[in-house]
Amino acid sequence: MELRRKLCIVVAVFVIVIEFASANFVFKAQHKFAGKKKNLEHFKSHDTRRHSRMLASIDLPLGGDSRVDSVGLYFTKIKLGSPPKEYHVQVDTGSDILWINCKPCPKCPTKTNLNFRLSLFDMNASSTSKKVGCDDDFCSFISQSDSCQPALGCSYHIVYADESTSDGKFIRDMLTLEQVTGDLKTGPLGQEVVFGCGSDQSGQLGNGDSAVDGVMGFGQSNTSVLSQLAATGDAKRVFSHCLDNVKGGGIFAVGVVDSPKVKTTPMVPNQMHYNVMLMGMDVDGTSLDLPRSIVRNGGTIVDSGTTLAYFPKVLYDSLIETILARQPVKLHIVEETFQCFSFSTNVDEAFPPVSFEFEDSVKLTVYPHDYLFTLEEELYCFGWQAGGLTTDERSEVILLGDLVLSNKLVVYDLDNEVIGWADHNCSSSIKIKDGSGGVYSVGADNLSSAPRLLMITKLLTILSPLIVMAFTSLA
């Protein structure tokens, strides 16, 4: 399924914990625009570009808080090669591959406003770099060409909806991650992975104020780093996040979470996004009528990289009308996008909660402090949006972003094809389990005594990328 309409997104600070069969790994996240003044126009333009850059094959960007003043880019420092060298990459659950700008690359970005220097990966400087041939098993995941010659490389060509492109070849080298060795303690551990070595970027990928060294995809396909680690038995295809929209932090984990426990609902099979079956929706007990197409085709997408929540127009109108019946306020439109109002008392006491019920009777409740955000003192806006999202078959869909998922531990279990969640204090910690059965605490603020890694995921637009990814064999 390929989504056509562009939307908005906001993402925030988080920590990544990657659990392998014998180890767990962590990254520290940091927000780009922390403390800066809210700017809805900037937020909207970021959202639009974000949507354009999400790969068409799959979609689920990472997330953080749902505050408009947090809009920006989130990145992580990873280490590649031997000896390991640091690179700043966008972390994207909406795409499949890890790719890095490589030498030579005359069109790669040379500067960024993110307070770090951009770096080009140099195969000649790494003793463990190896080219991936077109006859390699990895290349067979993405290329159906019958004209492969063993001496040729396995190359990729990505075209994004905003017409940005990335071209390069796949190579195999060491990825160094931070292994969790105990409660709030880590140490480095290397794993061999295949990633793209980008030699030609254009459009927003080749310039821009928020340029990074590459993109790290956490998608469902066999080409993602997560799938590569799972194929060798080094990790399970399970990842989780806990997003704190109060303090702007949280946890992102790849691997088994021991606690808190979550209730799960099945993923809709054979989808390019993280789709679930929404069975019902109510405003403090008052049921809303769901479009029949939504229930029939499982057209509800869970996307932590999207900050807001988007509904078909008829459902959106019913939602807002029912909320206002409980608490009448005078709405006005801000920047042609957001419905806002003045309010001086506690919103949780005045406005009703909104609940979603999914297959297997799994419920998710969103409170007023989650679905309302402040632009300035006593000026609130709804995070609900009339999205107008449709599939290629013109079926309407619902997109549930971070404002629905914040302050909850959300688990995506690709092995068992379920998604689950539980209310949780995302500024505290979670328990993760390693392959030996050991259980360790990992927190958002004090993960380890080892150097912490910065993490980032582009918090811009919503949905899945309208993109075409083509792979060919190049000399």
Swiss-Prot record:
Enzyme Commission number, as recorded: 3.4.23.-
Cell compartments where the protein resides: Cell membrane; Cytoplasm, Cytosol
Principal place of residence: membrane
Membrane topology reported for the UniProt record: Lipid-anchor; GPI-anchor
Domain of life from the UniProt record: Eukaryota
Domain Peptidase A1: 74-422
InterPro entries (UniProt xref): Aspartic_peptidase_A1, Pepsin-like_plant, PEPTIDASE_A1, Peptidase_aspartic_dom_sf, TAXi_C, TAXi_N
Catalytic residues (UniProt): D92, D303
Single annotated GO MF: aspartic-type endopeptidase activity
Family annotation (Gene3D superfamilies): Acid Proteases (2.40.70.10)
Residues with glycosylation annotation: N124, N222, N425, N446
Primary role: Displays aspartic proteolytic activity. Together with A36, contributes to pollen and ovule development, including the apical cell wall constitution of the growing pollen tubes.
Similarity field: Belongs to the peptidase A1 family.
Protein name from the UniProt record: Aspartic proteinase 39
Species of the source: Arabidopsis thaliana
